[in-house]
Amino acid sequence: MGADLSGQDLQEVQISYCNLDQANLADAKLIQASIQHTTLNNANLHGADFTNSDTYNISFNHADLTDAIFTGSLLQRASFDGANITGADFSSTLIQPVRQRLKLCDVASGVNPTTGVVTRDSLGCW
């Protein structure tokens, strides 16, 4: 198992070149965080709040992102292969490359219990 940072207030934290694979960040507050060149593969991010965060080259592969909030975030070169995004809110989030957003639309479902936003709607899925 990875680090246990569940429920932690990590607002405005700066994380670079970290391996947080299998970490528990459930319900962590990562509001306005800057996260770069970091892996969160197989991590528990259930209910984590990434509002207005700036990420670059980050991997969420096979992570649990259920009910996570990414509102207003910038997700550049983010990878979500096999991630569970049920109930996640991506409203006003810039996801690059665009093909990543399209891949997320293929698996998007649910409604975020905090914001009340439908995941597919927040991604702009057709």
Regions found by a protein language model. Give the residues of each.
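Tandem repeat scaffolds
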Residues: 1-126
